[in-house]
Swiss-Prot record:
Protein name from the UniProt record: Putative mRNA-capping enzyme P5
Keywords from the UniProt entry: GTP-binding, Host cytoplasm, mRNA capping, mRNA processing, Nucleotide-binding, Nucleotidyltransferase, RNA-binding, Transferase, Virion
Function: Enzyme involved in mRNA capping (Potential). Binds to GTP and might have guanylyltransferase activity. Together with the RNA-directed RNA polymerase P1 and protein P7, forms an transcriptional complex positioned near the channels situated at each of the five-fold vertices of the core.
Domain of life per record: Viruses
Alphabetical list of InterPro entries matching this protein: P5_Phytoreov
Entry annotated with the keyword Acetylation: no
EC numbers: 2.7.7.50
Enzyme class label: transferase
Signal peptide: none
Location relative to the cell: Virion; Host cytoplasm
Catalysed reactions, semicolon-separated: a 5'-end diphospho-ribonucleoside in mRNA + GTP + H(+) = a 5'-end (5'-triphosphoguanosine)-ribonucleoside in mRNA + diphosphate
Amino acid sequence: MSNPDYCIPNFSQTVNERTIIDIFTICRYRSPLVVFCLSHTELAKKYAQDVSMSSGTHVHIIDGSVEITTSLYRTFRTIATQLLGRMQIVVFVTVDKSVVSTQVMKSTAWASRGSFVELRNQSVDSSTLVNKLENLVSFAPLYNVPKCGPDYYGPTVYSELLSLATNARTHWYATIDYSMFTRSVLTGFIAKYFNEEAVPIDKRIVSIVGYNPPYVWTCLRHGIRPTYIQKSLPNPGGKGPFGLILPVINELVLKSKVKYVMHNPQIKLLCLDTFMLSTSMNILYIGAYPATHLLSLQLNGWTILAFDPKITSDWTDAMAKATGAKVIGVNKEFDFKSFSVQANQLNMFQNSKLSVIDDTWVETDYEKFQAEKQAYFEWLIDRTSIDVRLISMKWNRSKDTSVSHLLALLPQPYGASIREMRAFFHKKGASDIKILAAETEKYMDDFTAMSVSDQINTQKFMHCMITTVGDALKMDLDGGRAVIASYSLSNSSNPKERVLKFLSDANNGKAMVVFGAPNTYRLAYAKKVGLVLDSAIKMSKDLITFSNPTGRRWRDYGYSQSELYDAGYVEITIDQMVDYSSDVYNGVGYFANSTYNDLFSWYIPKWYVHKRMLMQDIRLSPAALVKCFTTLIRNICYVPHETYYRFRGILVDKYLRSKNVDSISLFHYWSGSKTFTVLSHFEVPHECGPLVFEASTDVNVSGHLLSLAIAAHFVASPMILWAEQMKYMAVDRMLPPNLDKSLFFDNKVTPSGALQRWHSREEVLLAAEICESYAAMMLNNKHSPDIIGTLKSAINLVFKI
């Protein structure tokens, strides 16, 4: 271009605060990807045309015409540039499962935060297949299959959505949705950890720091038993040794409303039964049929003795197959009149811990029937041959009643319409207490008058029974211990020094503590550029005050990557955790994110990263981040591809000149695959040890690192995990024998089956040195030096000799 009037496009011409806020906004629906597997290429082509013409969807088809790993590489490298493009992306996969498995395609979809549909077992005229394809066109650009999960828990009727919209809480509902997804993923990740570390099934217990009710449900979906640990519990205000007999229903109960279960005809039993299944792996379930609410749970290791006259062998087999539990179905009524363990087959639980769920009811003389049940359960609690942990009994007493061993008498969440309560019997229950019928009637009147969400929230009384009161920072951290500390340990009541010491001890002791906290510098950056957040937020250095639309207010400390890495912790994204766990994940997905969620980061101990995660495949790849932000900014600014790499090369050249490297020592290519060739040996002094460049070697400065640094301004960015992987993969590594090699399609594989190195140490550290200049260029000096500084500091710690 010799015309002197021609101006080379650059980022300063376009990027301003409005541009940056727009990028934050786009992140709400980032990665609008659907991966759809079917066996019919012509059908895929038809619907590809339909969805493209109707909604502008970008469509790719993997049909076997190109070798599968090459096809995956080309397709998903292309998609990586489009994930912030505001247009839906659909990939149709029509190759056979023997060529690329369901698991590989699910992992690949989830790596880009996509929805996944597997229908390769459906015939071309299958109504299921056709309906899914029709929905793909009808619901574009938001397909009605959740991202990164098999289920969704949010509003399912238009009236709920309308209520949210008219109260200006639609954005906040997306925050709740994604928060639930996050908790579900953390649980799935712990399940993966238990599997990999071969933790015995009866030891698969996770400690939850702080209280949030969804963990009970999502733990049981992953075959894990939860326990809570809290610094204190508000006094329930009821009778009995723990105040749980008709506890007071006041603002302490109602202030944190969490709706979390999916619509289900037996929804009223889900809260109760998941809680009871958490108390023991041996369950006597009386009145079990049909128990469809249990079918989505994973109960490997549980033994369920189920009594119900409607039980059949088919029901027993189906329940066992769906849940993985050992199910013994008895198709008769339980004998409450016979005070005998053997009469009801309970001798199988001798010398075992047992919990009992009672959901029985009779039409005739129900009061007498309840008295018989109560007497039997009081007797059973006193048996020494069986360790009865807890008994829940359906309670609808209409007369004054004296009770022994009563620990709690609680309203049944979702049970207001039938005025149902649950009595809980335990060895430490009240030895002799009188329950007045008039008192319970008044109590249920008050309960019935509450809103449904308030009624649901009373489940926290049940969860008090699996809660330990104590200081989480003093808990024992033996190897094999699993702890989820998300949205909790970062609370301002926990000094940062103690938290970092606790995490350091966890890493050194090879415990699995997953830690989540606000990201100090990303939050500060969002506020600096004027982003309107989903929650009102004030900052004083690293102390953050949150006020959400529900009226709740709390304070947290923010944390940075470098201070967590100093404590032995590495940032990993929720996306990577769900993808890494995709073979065991049985939680929920989501549809929309929120800026609030993107202010948080999650961290896992370095010992686990070094043991399990140094070999990067698509599940642990930052592929969904490394291209989309830089491509979006480059396209907004109309900066040509070649010009972008030339700008990047100039930054490298400028840095090397500042280190007195003679220009005759290298030859610049300034391309995407090669930054320069070393003509003669030179070294650059560096705090991590000298950077050594040998003659005749090609140097490709890491674009991944630079792209991750830009992404880190907007979303959680796993730069340190990536750096740990680059350090390990700085030499060729053999493919692991226990993984499908298709997961490594984004890597280069040698003919001998080795993964070629990604980058040399020098290429990574050289990129880190130009990182701030690069961010300043891309964001027109509206970058965050703090974000870049903490990333660079942590990377230097990774590579320090």
